[in-house]
Design a protein with these regions (language model features):
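Short, charged, intrinsically disordered terminal tails
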Residues: 144-154
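Active-site pocket-lining segment
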Residues: 71-80
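Residue-level signal for inorganic ion chemistry
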Residues: 45, 76, 139
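C-terminal edge-of-domain segments
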Residues: 131-144
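Compact, glycine-rich, soluble single-domain proteins
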Residues: 18-70, 83-111, 115-116, 121
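Divalent-metal-activated hydrolytic enzyme cores
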Residues: 114-129, 134
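N-terminal intrinsically disordered, cationic/polar leader segments
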Residues: 5-14, 18, 33
Length: 154
């Protein structure tokens, strides 16, 4: 499972001209699901992402988490995070989970976020969405459970 997490001042997602999710200060999480992902990866990634302390304290040090700043979460499904650009000029997306598994684990990730105390605003799996955000910093992190859960700490 892969996530691109951005610290934002605000973010929203629009489908067919209607804003379906909107947040103030917090995290915009673009979420991609791989074919071997399970509910275990969902929970791990939700805990890791929502626990990050990447907001600045009074000394300008990244030391505060969502809870300390009253932050919100917007999650948008993004199968293109599994795009393979090794050959040619058009990406292949065969490394992404199929729609059934992708949607199930996307919904599970949303539920895990809510269970951790951060009920997310969100887009709709498989929809054509317009995402707007005002980045804060910018601070953007790439989280990949294949690396986070399986590699020894350096």
């Amino acid at each position: 499972m892969r996530a691109v997490l951005t610290r934002v001042k605000s973010a929203s997602v629009t489908i067919d001209g209607e804003v379906v999710g909107k947040i103030g200060k917090g995290f915009l999480i673009l979420l991609g699901v791989g074919p071997n992902d399970t509910e275990k990866e969902c929970r791990y990634l939700a805990e890791k992402a929502l626990g990050l302390r990447i907001f600045e304290d009074e000394n300008g040090k990244m030391n505060l988490g969502l809870d300390a700043i009253g932050g919100e979460v917007l999650v948008v499904s993004q199968f293109t995070l599994y795009g393979n650009c090794r050959k040619g000029r058009r990406p292949s997306f065969t490394d992404a989970a199929g729609p059934e598994l992708g949607n199930a684990l996307y919904e599970k990730f949303l539920a895990d976020c809510a269970a951790l105390g951060y009920p997310p605003q969100h887009g709709r799996f498989g929809a054509d969405m317009k995402v707007e955000s005002i980045n804060d910093g910018p601070v953007t992190l790439i989280l990949d459970t294949d690396q986070l859960m399986n590699e020894p700490r350096r």
